[in-house]
Design a protein with these regions (language model features):
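C-terminal transmembrane helical hairpin of 12-TM major facilitator-type secondary transporters
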Residues: 323, 329-373
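Intracellular loop-helix junctions on the cytosolic face of multi-pass helical membrane proteins
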Residues: 1-21, 113-120, 129-132, 136, ...
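Helix-loop boundary and gating motifs at the non-cytosolic
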Residues: 8-66, 255-260, 264-289
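Loop-to-transmembrane helix entry/capping segments in MFS-fold secondary transporters
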Residues: 55-56, 146-156, 298, 381-393
Length: 471
């Protein structure tokens, strides 16, 4: 792509409108990315336990997710902002490298033969997914005019939903629709889970490759300005210092929301880590990872995760209606309390089919977590520092996950006596606490939720990018 001759800056020159299919193509890669995340979130604890991890060790092994999110996202965001190649563009090199590494990791993961291999592959997989995902957020701001950005993030949200539903359910589909064995030899991964990861790796790479091939990026509007800005902002350490300094200079509403986010994401991480162990031991009454019952339970957890993800997309349509009738604080409080009750209710379930009812509450909470806090926060931030503070806000997603990774293992072993169902109950209590704390948040009266459904990927993301709320 030839360098432009115009001298207008990005702020003064309007980007051309893109067609529906151009927006579709630039967002299609998220289908593959979410396949990877869905397989990781619903199956890693199962793989760790199969490789011999004790119940109290699993949370610590999951620390890879928040740590890579905290480190990789700002690094890739920083580097991709300062990258330009006439042939490869700005974001596409990172799409390709991340997709290639993540796809290979997905293929290798179900073939690990030792716990240390599984733990190491999670670090590689999570880092690689973040390498691909982070620039996708910024791509919408790069290519779309402001009036089309909601459509752009809406398209990403659609592919995120489809990827989460299908990706989480893949092991169950292979076992129940295609008759693939889900009962492995001791210390090995079941064939149905292997096939799910193989398909996930293929879909990840091909979906991202489609976006790379079918999307053209614009060069910097003024190459001289671009190079000057790179020189002016050089020094990644300075960027990290500014970000961490922002924690100590947050506006009041942001401080209040940070506490809500802490308890919300602590609960979510508890669920992602321990649902498989809680369901298999408490409802299926087995801890034998080579048994048919255990693997049936593990597959069912994937179905449950697909249900809450799918339901959240539907609930997102109703959130603005409830918020306009009441308030955003009440809406978020109600959603989080329902999510907490959903998690706690799993303790009382004997028939595994009824876990789907519990997932209704979780899906409602998930829809709200991915939207309402960002809408409330947007009204409390100065417009010229929106992106900066949204990046700082991301810390209160990864920090609680890190805390959960450090303390949930000892709590499960010493307080709950190796009964992970009580760890889920703790997560439910944490989510209810987050809901009650929402009532303390100051929300500007003149800020309203949009009339159309938008998740965290869309709400205010003109300013949010490249911050990313996902693990």
């Amino acid at each position: 792509m030839a360098a432009p001759t115009a001298v207008a800056t990005a702020s003064t020159r309007e980007k051309p409108r893109l067609s529906f299919w151009q927006i579709w193509n630039m967002s299609f890669g998220f289908l593959g990315i979410q396949f990877g995340f869905a397989l990781q979130n619903s199956n890693m604890s199962r793989i760790f336990e199969t490789m011999g991890a004790k119940t109290d060790e699993i949370a610590f092994l999951w620390l890879a997710a928040p740590i890579t999110g905290l480190l990789v996202q700002p690094v890739i965001g920083y580097l991709s902002d300062r990258t330009w190649s006439p042939r490869w563009g700005r974001r596409r090199p990172y799409f390709f490298v991340g997709a290639l590494l993540a796809s290979l990791a997905l293929i290798v993961m179900p073939n690990v033969t030792a716990l240390w291999m599984a733990a190491g592959m999670l670090w590689i997989l999570d880092s690689s997914i973040n390498i691909s995902m982070e620039p996708f957020r910024a791509l919408v701001g790069d290519l779309l005019p402001s009036q089309q950005r909601t459509t752009g993030f809406g398209a990403q949200t659609f592919f995120i939903g489809v990827g989460a539903i299908v990706g989480s359910s893949l092991p169950w589909m292979f076992a129940n629709w295609f008759g693939v064995s889900n009962t492995p030899e001791p210390g090995h991964i079941s064939l149905s889970l292997k096939y799910a990861f193989y398909v996930g790796g293929l879909v990840f790479f091909l979906a991202v490759l489609w976006t790379i091939i079918r999307t053209k990026e614009y060069p910097p509007e003024n190459l001289a300005e671009f190079e000057a800005e790179k020189a002016r902002t050089a020094g990644f350490a300075n960027g990290l210092k500014e970000s961490f300094d922002g924690i100590f200079h947050m506006p009041k509403t942001m401080r209040q929301l940070a506490v809500v986010q802490f308890f919300s994401w602590f609960a979510l991480f508890s669920m992602w880590i321990y649902t498989t162990q809680a369901v298999t031991s408490h409802i299926f009454h087995t801890t034998d990872t080579a048994s048919a019952l255990y693997n049936k339970g593990g597959d069912w957890v994937g179905v449950c995760f697909s249900v809450y993800n799918g339901l959240s997309a539907v609930v997102a349509l109703l959130l603005p209606v409830v918020a306009r009738a009441t308030s955003r604080r009440f809406t978020h409080m109600l959603a989080l309390v329902m999510g907490g009750v959903g998690l706690i209710s799993i303790y009382f379930i004997q028939d595994y089919h009824y876990i789907l009812i519990s997932m209704v509450g979780v899906g409602i909470a998930w829809a709200s977590i991915l939207s309402v806090p960002y809408a409330m926060l947007a009204g409390a931030l100065p417009s010229n520092k929106m992106g900066y503070y949204m990046g700082v806000f991301n810390f209160f997603i990864v920090i609680p996950q890190g805390v959960a990774g450090l303390i949930l293992g000892p709590l499960t072993k010493h307080v709950f006596h190796d009964q992970p169902i009580f760890t889920l109950v703790l997560g439910g209590a944490s989510m209810i606490m987050a809901g009650l704390l929402t009532l303390r948040v100051h929300d500007a009266d003149d800020i309203r939720l949009p009339a159309e459904a938008e998740s965290a990927e869309t709400l205010g993301y003109d300013a949010l990018a490249p911050a990313n709320p996902q693990v």
